[in-house]
């Protein structure tokens, strides 16, 4: 490919609204262009990278016997009503009506659609197991699209689904996908961490996330030297033992005025107590009405755990208006004492040992102190609701957990019979009895992989692409292509090298400085410079990851160039510059 013919509009500066290094560099390097919040066009360089990521994923899917299909983006609402997820999935689902007033969605995922297809085809146990995948655009109406390709409204994803007659077969497929995802990470060259994960709106019995490590990642990951690792949404907390309750004698319940204080710390300072002696009351609205969740004042509530325990993905925190309208009190003073019996009260286990604690007074400007469980209010259900943080004891060994950040690229689920039972997906076994399919699903973010690689592999000059997905392997920079000898050698090298490598020939009439800066910005692994040293019979080779140049003589032909190129590309390792701990 000749640079003079390549549509790669590079920029000196990134747009002011680009919030991560990856999207700044991808825009500056001419890989993508933003069309709207969370919506991007892939230009030729970006599409080359995207296609290479796709190819790696396809090869790993083929290696485990997963067959490729292509499903429609538009899905009828009826399928989602069958599964019960039309309302449960949440506001991220893009819904619309056609001209006949029929409801449809732009698919955020395809469990329902594929189940509706195979339930009419897979009837006998002899047809199992079966694994199918597609690579296609997905759509989610993110409330705040951000981080470039990482949190977009339209994105490219590989989603696979497996169908089984027994759990042993699902376990094998799950392990196959687990290993395949590890190989994808390794082939791309990413540093990564696999963690136990929350199943969220997808549902199921077991789930793992594959995260590319990045300080700018959205995912918070907790891990321990013993091998335990989980997302903060999933990480269990080693609760205080019921055998160590607060030994204080019960005090009288007292409603005290707390003028002008709302936050936990303000209440603690005013009442001269610690945040641990305050219980926060968080009100949520769900399918079955209001739910009050109680958590200690020094802790944060894990909404994912709350949704999972209550089996309600529609739970959202009640608004100021809803609290005032239904309970007649501002949100900062809501509490469990005297709460309406119709409101379900759930609490984190760490609240159970407390005695004489502080809660909202159900009256503006007031709090209760001296509150005791059982005497002053009752809890309907106890759960682990705490958002685990760095330093919390590991649930497996008790040692303090460590924390890192990551970008979720892969997510695998054991769905079990959640969809097959609801959508009448049954097979007949060898005894003629009917059973629901046992399913798994396995997602991989193709487009966000681009951003994850750039987040890990870049420097102050630009991107540093791994060889496996680089838009080109080599760029030949002709310093002054109008000079006959430079042009001749550059063209000869281009014709020779493109037989084995993907080569970009920079034949533009531009200054050497512009060409060198563009080569670094675009991040091509190896640069060959044909310039002023040609008068001495020399050309210069430089890896994107290194500062030093390698001079190679071409006085006796190009054999030494071929040998040096092969040697340099073998040692090329952008992971060494990955900006992660």
From Swiss-Prot:
CDD domains: ProRS-INS, ProRS_anticodon_short, ProRS_core_prok. Signal peptide: none annotated. The keyword Aminoacyl-tRNA synthetase applies. PROSITE patterns: AA_TRNA_LIGASE_II. One of its GO terms (cellular component) is cytosol. Its main location: cytoplasm. It comes from the Bacteria. Consists of three domains: the N-terminal catalytic domain, the editing domain and the C-terminal anticodon-binding domain. Homodimer. This is Proline--tRNA ligase.
């Amino acid at each position: 490919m000749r640079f003079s013919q390549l549509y790669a509009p590079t920029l000196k500066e990134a747009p002011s609204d680009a919030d991560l290094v990856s999207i700044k560099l991808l825009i500056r390097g001419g890989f993508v262009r933003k069309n709207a919040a969370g919506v991007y066009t892939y230009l030729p360089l970006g599409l080359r990278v995207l296609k290479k990521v796709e190819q790696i994923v396809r090869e790993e899917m083929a290696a485990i016997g997963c067959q490729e299909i292509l499903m429609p983006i538009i899905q009828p609402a009826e399928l989602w009503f069958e599964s019960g997820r039309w309302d449960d999935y949440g506001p991220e689902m893009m819904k619309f009506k056609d001209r006949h007033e029929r409801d449809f969605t732009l698919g955020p995922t395809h469990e329902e659609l594929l189940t509706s297809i195979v339930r009419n085809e897979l009837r006998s146990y002899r047809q199992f197991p079966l694994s199918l995948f597609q690579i296609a655009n997905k759509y989610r109406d993110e409330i705040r699209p951000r981080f470039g390709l990482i949190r977009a409204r339209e994105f490219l994803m590989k989603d696979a689904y497996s169908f089984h007659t027994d759990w042993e077969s699902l376990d094998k497929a799950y392990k196959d996908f687990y290993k395949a995802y590890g190989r994808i990470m390794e082939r791309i060259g990413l540093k990564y961490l696999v963690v136990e994960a929350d199943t969220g709106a997808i549902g199921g019995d077991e789930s793992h996330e594959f995260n590319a490590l990045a300080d700018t990642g959205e995912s918070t990951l907790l891990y321990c030297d013993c091998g335990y690792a989980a997302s903060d949404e999933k990480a269990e907390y080693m609760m205080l033992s019921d055998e160590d309750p607060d030994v204080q004698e019960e005090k009288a319940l007292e409603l005290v005025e707390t003028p002008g204080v709302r936050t936990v710390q303000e209440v603690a300072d005013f009442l001269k107590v610690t945040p641990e002696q305050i219980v926060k009351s968080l009100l949520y609205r769900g399918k079955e009405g209001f739910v009050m969740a109680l958590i200690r004042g020094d802790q944060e509530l894990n909404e994912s755990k709350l949704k999972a325990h209550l089996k309600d993905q529609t739970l959202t925190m009640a608004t100021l208006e809803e609290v005032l309208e239904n309970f007649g009190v501002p949100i900062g003073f809501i509490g469990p004492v005297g709460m309406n019996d119709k409101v379900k009260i759930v609490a984190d286990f760490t609240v159970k040992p407390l005695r004489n604690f502080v809660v909202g007074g159900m009256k503006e400007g007031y709090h209760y102190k001296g509150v005791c469980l059982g005497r002053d209010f009752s809890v309907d259900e106890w759960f682990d609701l705490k958002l685990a943080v760095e330093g919390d004891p590991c649930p497996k060994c008790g040692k303090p957990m460590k924390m890192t950040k990551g970008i979720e690229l892969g997510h695998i689920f054991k769905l079990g019979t959640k969809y097959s039972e609801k959508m009448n997906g049954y097979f007949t076994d060898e005894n003629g009895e009917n059973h629901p399919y046992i399913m798994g699903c396995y997602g991989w973010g193709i487009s966000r992989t681009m951003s994850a690689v750039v987040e890990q592999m870049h420097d102050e000059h630009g991107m540093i692409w791994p060889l496996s997905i680089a838009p080109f392997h080599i760029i030949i920079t002709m310093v002054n292509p109008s000079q006959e000898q430079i042009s001749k050698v550059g063209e000869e090298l281009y014709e020779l090298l493109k037989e084995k490598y993907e080569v970009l020939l920079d034949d533009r009439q531009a200054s050497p400085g512009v060409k060198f800066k563009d080569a670094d910005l675009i991040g091509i692994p190896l640069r060959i410079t044909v310039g002023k040293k040609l008068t001495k019979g020399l050309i210069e080779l430089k890896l994107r990851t290194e500062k030093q140049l390698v001079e190679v003589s071409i006085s006796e032909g190009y054999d030494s160039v071929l040998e040096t190129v092969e040697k340099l590309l073998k040692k090329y390792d952008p992971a060494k510059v990955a900006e992660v701990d």
